[in-house]
């Protein structure tokens, strides 16, 4: 099952939301999030609902946007400003899911994996844009920049 298929199942049967394991990390598109919950008129409404839902479900919800929001089970949200619009290219969300899963596999806690994963992908997108253009970013090019992004973080 693909990640987006699981979110679509939740959208069609909202009672599945309550079966999401504690500490899970959800990364829906805005449209998927609206289908999982309700249609939101503004980004602020969507963010508010995501924060409430993350707290209720004791999970993490990542909403990508100009500033990517990482909604925490504590009822707070962290914002990452490292990315660019190139991250909306086909497959880039799958790269982010893979990076976060890889970090969890390395022993990172969910909150650290989510924040580091979002920041690494954002930094990789900026590195690509510095050499090319943010509009030309593909998922494979994002992957190609991850090593450089990680090294840059380690240097600081």
Regions found by a protein language model. Give the residues of each.
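Charged C-terminal helix
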Residues: 123-156
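Phosphate-handling active-site elements
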Residues: 104-117, 126-131
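Glycine-rich phosphate/dinucleotide-binding loop and adjoining beta-alpha-beta core of small-molecule
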Residues: 1-82, 153-155
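Short glycine/threonine-rich catalytic loop with a Thr-x-Gly-x-Asp
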Residues: 84-100, 110, 135
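Feature representing long, continuous alpha-helical segments
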Residues: 48-51, 78, 97-98, 111, ...
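Hydrophobic, well-ordered secondary-structure elements that form the walls
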Residues: 3, 94, 113
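Buried hydrophobic packing segments
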Residues: 96-104, 117, 121, 142, ...
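Short, charged, surface-exposed loops that flank catalytic or proteolytic processing sites
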Residues: 38-48, 107-112, 133-137
């Amino acid at each position: 099952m693909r990640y987006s298929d699981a979110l679509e199942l939740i959208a069609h049967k909202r009672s599945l939301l309550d079966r999401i394991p504690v500490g899970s990390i959800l990364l829906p598109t805005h449209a998927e999030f609206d289908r999982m919950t309700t249609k939101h008129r503004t980004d602020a409404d969507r963010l508010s609902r995501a924060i409430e839902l993350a707290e209720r479900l004791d999970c993490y919800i990542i909403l990508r946007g100009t500033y990517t929001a990482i909604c925490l089970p504590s009822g707070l949200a962290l914002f990452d400003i490292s990315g660019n619009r190139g991250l909306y290219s086909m497959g880039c969300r799958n790269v982010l899911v893979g990076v976060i899963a890889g970090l969890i596999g390395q022993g990172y806690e969910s909150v650290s994996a989510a924040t580091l994963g979002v920041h690494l992908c954002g930094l990789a997108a900026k590195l690509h844009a510095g050499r090319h253009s943010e509009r030309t970013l593909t998922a494979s090019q994002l992957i190609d920049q991850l090593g450089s992004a990680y090294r840059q973080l380690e240097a600081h």
